[in-house]
Amino acid sequence: MNGDKSTLSVIVAGGGTAGHIEPALAVADAIKAIDDTAVVTALGTARGLETTLVPERGYPLELIPPVPLPRKPTLDLLRLPGRVRASVRRTREVLDATGADVVVGFGGYVALPAYLAAGPGLLRRRRRIPIVVHEANASAGIANKIGARRAARVLAAVAGSGVSARGRSDAEILGIPVRASITALDRAALRAEARAHFGLPADGPVLLVFGGSQGARSLNEAVSGAAESLAAAGVAVLHAHGPKNTLDVPATPGGPPYVAVPYLSRMDLAYSAADAVICRSGAMTVAEVSAVGLPAVYVPLPHGNGEQELNARPVVAAGGGMIVADGDLSAGFVAETVIPLLRDPAQLEDMGRRAAGAGHRSAATEVARIVLDVAALTRGTR
């Protein structure tokens, strides 16, 4: 806890999934790079990925009760008011104990209690704490829509996400904060080390495949089903299939390796080893893949509100990738579309350049500066 009020205290609220946590931690890193005396505390719940990711990055984590928002009318909806009150009460305790100067929210069920505890309203505090909201997705969720109504600044990855500050027609468009280890990645310089790390050949095309932290069955089946075609074309594969999944890859004697792993802990090396990627199009995935200039075949999740396809559209429109529907992804598609791409160095180079041009490498620093400006303005008025 921060007892020294000569130092700046920042709360980042973005727990639950990696898509909420990683932007929060990227901004935390950028804040510390600008002001190493600042104290950054993360909010989270006991059931989110933040229990692992936040301590690994060296930040204190304060746990609050989760407030999942039911998508359909169920008994959980009746329990919601009580859960909100309990979570806001605990969040208020954290804000008081840390002497928070600003709250930065990234959406999800951790951000909502932070917005309610910091801002005005029935659950308002004696000391109002300014809020900065960042929306990573192309279509904003309910937490950020609520937070935007009371925020000092509202930021977003893309235009038209459905959130904006009072008096503005849209949010301030800055892109998605991405960790410095990715934005500063020199893929060419790390290529040899990366390929050796995964047991991939030093030369020849490499296809990277991943479906998020849990993998994706449709990606697994389509790409592994094309293993013989890939090997015949001289394409090596690095495939993260998910820790709960298995992958049945046919043997291809004499061909380049098909390296299957449950999870990739070194995404910097994975990106550096690859020439192209097949992946989902969550906001954070699109941000990282475009930031490193990697040509991509995006396969949006087939359910939800269609936001994954929206996330990928700007990069695809810039020429840095393509979108294929989950139901259209097959071993035949990999053989007929992906392999020719991997065998065309000129097209790969052009797509990589266009992908990098669509990325926002400085987003984390820009968001951090806004957060510090908002906090400084508030501290100056106390």
Curated annotation (Swiss-Prot):
The free-text function statement in the UniProt record for this protein reads:
Cell wall formation. Catalyzes the transfer of a GlcNAc subunit on undecaprenyl-pyrophosphoryl-MurNAc-pentapeptide (lipid intermediate I) to form undecaprenyl-pyrophosphoryl-MurNAc-(pentapeptide)GlcNAc (lipid intermediate II).
Checking Pfam families in the record gives: Glyco_tran_28_C, Glyco_transf_28
* Protein name, entry field: UDP-N-acetylglucosamine--N-acetylmuramyl-(pentapeptide) pyrophosphoryl-undecaprenol N-acetylglucosamine transferase
Binding-site positions, UDP-N-acetyl-alpha-D-glucosamine: T17, A18, G19, N137, R179, S213, Q308
What is the protein's species of origin? Rhodococcus jostii (strain RHA1)
Q: Which reaction does it catalyse?
A: di-trans,octa-cis-undecaprenyl diphospho-N-acetyl-alpha-D-muramoyl-L-alanyl-D-glutamyl-meso-2,6-diaminopimeloyl-D-alanyl-D-alanine + UDP-N-acetyl-alpha-D-glucosamine = di-trans,octa-cis-undecaprenyl diphospho-[N-acetyl-alpha-D-glucosaminyl-(1->4)]-N-acetyl-alpha-D-muramoyl-L-alanyl-D-glutamyl-meso-2,6-diaminopimeloyl-D-alanyl-D-alanine + UDP + H(+)
Broad class of enzyme this protein falls into: transferase
By its UniProt entry, which HAMAP family does this protein fall under? MurG
Topology in membrane: Peripheral membrane protein
Signal peptide residues are none
Reported EC number(s) for this entry are 2.4.1.227
Keyword list, A-Z: Cell cycle, Cell division, Cell membrane, Cell shape, Cell wall biogenesis/degradation, Glycosyltransferase, Membrane, Peptidoglycan synthesis, Transferase
List the GO molecular function terms. Answer: UDP-N-acetyl-D-glucosamine:N-acetylmuramoyl-L-alanyl-D-glutamyl-meso-2,6-diaminopimelyl-D-alanyl-D-alanine-diphosphoundecaprenol 4-beta-N-acetylglucosaminlytransferase activity; undecaprenyldiphospho-muramoylpentapeptide beta-N-acetylglucosaminyltransferase activity
